[in-house]
């Protein structure tokens, strides 16, 4: 397993692989690896002969009040885990991703609007910029992104499509604990009481999704009823011990345009005609996703389920 600490080293390794016709798959991470990350390597190994895992805590996607300085950094443990898989051919862990005087950023629209961007307006510009850099600095042909960060996945897919980047984005299913909690590096922040309450977010999403599916089968969906279902899910999350819910949103799965319900208050940037069109086709739309973000103590958890 090669360890590359700068762009030149990484590109030299990738060039050697490409010269022999090997397909390179990238698994981008910020470290503090868990079984969810390892599952991405398993998928990457199915799609290419060579797998690169990047480890880089990207400062551009953290606001000043967020947890950049305290974000878990477990480099040696991460390297040990990657080596143990036997699936990682190179680790790209640059000291910095940006040249001195770097002043260019990618600012995505479309799928980046609403949801996470309401409380984290800086986030997707930071994500899109660093992911673009990773694609360039690894010369990968494919990249694996988890569906747990569903909006992020859609933003990256949109960027690749809009900029004709020529890299294939492969979605990977969310990996969960036995009680349903989606694996996340930030789960390590949870104390015992918070950890016991945390699965309520997924449980509420599941129950809401079941109600939405049943409603659609019965009468094609009713906006007031959908709003009630989402409000009930939000109340269940709060009752379980979460302090607040940033959003509980029903969206079209492809472009993440809001469909209807409690997420309407987060859709003010979307054109009114788009929202009306989405509502008209909501009943017949098989591809919808229910997304949520909620805070328990100082920890913010996100999750989603398909509807």
Predicted feature locations:
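Nucleotidyltransferase catalytic core that binds NTPs
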Residues: 2-242, 263, 298
């Amino acid at each position: 397993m090669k360890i590359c600490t700068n762009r030149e080293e990484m590109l030299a390794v990738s060039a050697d692989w490409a010269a022999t016709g090997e397909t390179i798959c990238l698994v981008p991470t910020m470290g503090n690896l868990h079984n969810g990350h390892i599952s991405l390597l398993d998928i990457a190994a199915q799609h290419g002969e060579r797998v690169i895992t990047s480890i880089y805590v990207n400062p551009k996607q953290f606001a000043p009040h967020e947890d950049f300085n305290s974000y878990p950094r477990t480099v040696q443990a991460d390297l040990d885990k990657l080596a143990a898989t036997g699936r990682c051919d190179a680790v790209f862990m640059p000291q910095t991703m940006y040249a001195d005087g770097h002043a260019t950023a990618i600012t995505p629209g479309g799928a980046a609007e609403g949801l996470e961007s309401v409380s984290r307006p800086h986030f997707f510009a930071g994500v899109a910029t660093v992911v673009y850099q990773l694609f360039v600095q690894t010369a990968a042909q494919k990249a694996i992104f988890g569906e747990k960060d569903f909006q992020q996945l859609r933003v990256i897919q949109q960027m690749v499509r809009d900029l004709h980047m020529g890299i294939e984005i492969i979605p990977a299913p969310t990996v969960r604990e036995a009680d349903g909690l989606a694996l996340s590096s930030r789960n390590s922040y949870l104390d015992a009481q918070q950890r016991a309450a945390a699965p309520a977010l997924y449980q509420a999403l599941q129950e809401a999704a079941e109600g939405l599916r049943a409603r659609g089968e019965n009468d094609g969906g009713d906006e007031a009823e959908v709003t009630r279902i989402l409000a009930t899910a939000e109340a269940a999350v709060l009752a379980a011990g979460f302090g607040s819910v940033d959003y509980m949103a029903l969206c079209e799965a492809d472009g993440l345009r809001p469909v209807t319900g409690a997420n309407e208050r987060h859709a003010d940037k979307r054109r009114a005609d788009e929202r009306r069109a989405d509502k008209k086709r909501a009943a017949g739309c098989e591809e919808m996703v229910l997304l949520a973000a909620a805070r328990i103590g100082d920890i913010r958890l996100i999750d989603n389920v398909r509807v």
